[in-house]
């Protein structure tokens, strides 16, 4: 029996993508796979319906769990609050409970210096990341309070260390960290713990970049002290499973770097 059997986990940005070796090629899908192996029922949201459908098919067939998929695109033109409320309504109708919320979705324009950033580029990062986290957090709270659940949010070394060309992305991710610490403080009394992960994972985007531009990849992508870039399921998803488990309920409001030693900081 898996440790999350009978429980429900919501993961944003969890469409299916795989690497050339068949391993999970996106962080969200790696997390979904890790929880499916523990018997959790899953709610997966994202913009790309075909990737969500592919994830549902794969996870249900392999792990005998129930997967609810919902298209949700948080941007500066949609009624975002209504979209998130719809997600919560569907969770209540389908599963009747929510035990873990994982805000993973994020879009951004990378490599643009601050002086050249546009309002549109800033909005892309803020709405898909910070605003999405705010709305999901706000409307998941009643369900999480009932189960004394867990929240895991994703930030980045780009925000911690001010990476060049990551103005909008870093702003969104540091906003998410601040929002998460406030939630950890306010919701501790309800038995809800909230933590933040800063990951470094080998994704299908990185693999394609390496294949198409090997010289640029070598110059710009640095291997951490551990000697490899993290595995989305084994080294990111499995940590999410642990952080969301009862054994880690006392840990809240913390930023956890999963960067193989690259994110060393005081």
Describe each PLM feature range.
Residues 2-42:
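Canonical Rossmann dinucleotide-binding motif of NAD(H)/NADP(H)-dependent dehydrogenases/reductases
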Residues 20, 111, 161, 222-223, ...:
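Short C-terminal tail/terminal secondary-structure segment
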Residues 74, 214-234:
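Catalytic Tyr-x(3-8)-Lys segment
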Residues 87, 112-114, 118-123, 217-220:
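Substrate-binding pocket helix/loop in short-chain dehydrogenase/reductase
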Residues 99, 115-134, 152, 176:
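Catalytic Tyr-X3-Lys loop
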Residues 137, 172, 180:
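Active-site helix of classical SDR
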Residues 156:
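Residue(s) in the substrate-gating loop at a strand-loop-helix junction
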Residues 188, 193, 251-253:
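Short, small/polar-rich loop/turn modules that mediate ligand/substrate recognition or access, typified
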């Amino acid at each position: 029996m898996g440790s999350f059997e009978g429980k429900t986990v919501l993961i944003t940005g969890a469409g299916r993508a795989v690497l050339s070796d068949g391993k999970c090629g996106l962080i969200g899908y790696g997390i979904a796979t890790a929880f499916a192996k523990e018997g959790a029922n899953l709610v997966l949201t994202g913009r790309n319906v075909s990737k969500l459908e592919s994830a549902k098919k794969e996870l249900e067939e392999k792990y005998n769990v129930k997967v609810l998929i919902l298209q949700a695109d948080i941007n500066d033109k949609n009624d975002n609050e209504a979209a998130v409320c719809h997600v919560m309504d569907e969770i209540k109708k389908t599963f009747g409970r929510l035990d873990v919320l994982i805000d993973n979705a994020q879009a951004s324009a990378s490599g643009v210096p601050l002086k050249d950033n546009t309002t549109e580029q800033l909005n892309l990062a803020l709405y898909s990341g910070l605003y999405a986290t705010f709305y999901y957090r706000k409307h998941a709270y009643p369900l999480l309070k009932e189960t004394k659940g867990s929240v895991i949010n994703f930030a980045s070394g780009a925000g911690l260390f001010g990476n060049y060309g990551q103005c909008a992305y870093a702003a969104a991710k540091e906003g998410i960290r601040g929002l998460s610490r406030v939630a950890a403080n306010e919701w501790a009394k309800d038995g809800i713990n909230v933590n933040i992960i800063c990951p470094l994972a080998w994704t299908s985007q990185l693999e394609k970049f390496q294949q198409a531009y090997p010289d640029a990849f070598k110059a710009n992508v640095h291997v951490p002290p551990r000697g490899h870039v993290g595995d989305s399921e084994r080294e990111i998803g499995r940590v999410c499973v642990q952080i969301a488990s009862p054994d880690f309920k006392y840990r809240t409001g913390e930023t956890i770097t999963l960067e193989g030693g690259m994110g060393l900081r005081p």
